[in-house]
Amino acid sequence: MSAVKNAEGTQKLSVFKMTWPIFIEILLQMMVGNVDQFMLSHYSQHSVAAVGNANQIINIVILALSVISMAATILIAQHRGAGNREKVAEVCTVALLANMVFGVIISAALFIFDGFFLSLLDVPSDIWAEASLFLRYIGLFIVVQSAYISFISFFRGYSLLKITMITSVVMNLINIAGNCILIHGLGPIPSLGVLGVTISTNTSKVLGLLLILYFFHKFIDIRLSLKYLRPFPKSTLYKILYLGLPSGGESLSYQISQMVIMRFVNVMGIVVITTKIYAYIIAMFSYIYSQALAMATQIIVGFLIGAGDLDAVEQRVWKTIRIAVTISTTVTLLLFFNSDSIYGIFTDNPEVLELGRHIFLIEVFLEAGRAVNMVMVMSLQAAGDIKWPVTTGLVSMWSVATLGAWFFGLHLGWGLVGVWLAMCLDECLRALVFIYRWKSEGWRKNNLLE
């Protein structure tokens, strides 16, 4: 009965109160990468293209690290809903260990084999050196990022979302200050360009990790301990991987498909490359609040399922979808009607401005589908319904988005407009499939706590 009461209390919490700190946190996390490119845009367009290409690989790595962390957040929320504090501590310990091991391996791979990864993108020779520099030295600090992402997931599972927001604010301020000094130089400090970006970005990550460790010991009432690893809790690791690998596969598949699409774009010339990169940065403002809504809903869904209140889950998910679609569509329309002014922040190139207008007309429909997908995927994950998101994602992302980008963009010669049309069709098709799955109520049959 106490679990049900706890669930009712959680349901009464304003989703807005959970969403806005997540929104600010995600915005600032994305800005760590995008601020780099914005500030570099006043230094060199080639540097923007170099960092944009390297970030395609970094984004895949971050998503791979988020696989375990996302699963940890769901399990923490469910065990909290069921009132099992010891299991929460065990999940946190196992998740951190797994992510740290993975982080060390990835850091070494990116530093040593940077050339191999860049060749997969067919990076142009005139931006290769800067892309390699950025990938190697940002990659070297991925192990720091893996620990940071793990602790962020613990705070989300505990619904302590303002803490993660504060940490992101501090990290972003450090990164911006470092860029201001190091990109163009200041006084005796020379202009370092892309190297300066890597220094300020990595410094902000290290200090961010130290801050989140302090907050963990101050605000969370569990302690990580080796006792939870003796004997090793294979069942807990299995549940983390059961949730994380397929769920992460959906996101990972998306990023890999985007990497292939970037390869198509790279043969279209520097104007198209920079337009795509700027469009991605601007598009972030269309979907970021919907992503925050989806993440807040995932935490609530996990808690409610742990408490056994499935009817409340149903109501919460549909309400979130309506809000997410409305907000994403409204913001994208505003961006479309003001596209010249917004692109003008980055460049005055008339070719980029014209191409950007065409892209954002398609973006209106793309973002409506993406809003549905984000809420549905995270809700299905929280319910333990893992196979549908990853299967649908794999099929649609590759057969519609990637193949379509080649067909419309290169084969028919529609360029970046054709690429965006294919990605729009992918998002809308997946949205319809996920709506069908949720209405079938197959998600109600899963139980991760047994």
What residue spans do the PLM features occupy?
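Interfacial/gating helices of multi-pass transporter permease domains
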Residues: 40-59, 126-130, 194-196, 236-243, ...
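Transmembrane helical elements of multi-pass membrane transporters/channels
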Residues: 17-36, 137, 171, 204-208, ...
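Transmembrane alpha-helix boundary and packing residues in multipass membrane permease domains
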Residues: 22, 26, 37-38, 74, ...
